[in-house]
Amino acid sequence: MKIWVDADACPVVIKEILFRAAERTQTETILVANHAMRIPPSKYISRLQVSSGFDVADDEIVKRIAKGDLVITGDIPLASEVIDNGGQALNPRGELYTTENIRSILNVRDFMDTMRSSGVEMSGGPPPLSQTDRQNFANNLDRILAQNKAG
């Protein structure tokens, strides 16, 4: 299993958790972004810079994942494609997207997008990551990595 990170919008604190987990579990972790980024020196952590453009990083992740790989993303359409291709998707708040929940989450996202595009005022975006969110992310990441190690 590899970990692929949709790194353009991934919070720094989540990247730091991923860096520690990659080292601890010796799991290859690839950050995909359309800009240069700094990563710690590690044989388990690498970066892949793609050209700028709408969904270029997402498309590259979908093209490269293998069945069972984990993708870290808050992008619901990307998570849906990952699941359709046999991967796993975890968002930075620690919510695991699954075959059981991705369709309803995608439907809500599409509904909200339709509301915004029709001119309905929507209150701001999601709140900042809380300590609980960070803990949920770390716990679910550890659980997924342990399951992968167990086979």
From Swiss-Prot:
It comes from the Bacteria. Pfam families: DUF188 (PF02639). InterPro entries: UPF0178. Belongs to the UPF0178 family. This is UPF0178 protein PSHAb0045. It comes from Pseudoalteromonas translucida (strain TAC 125).
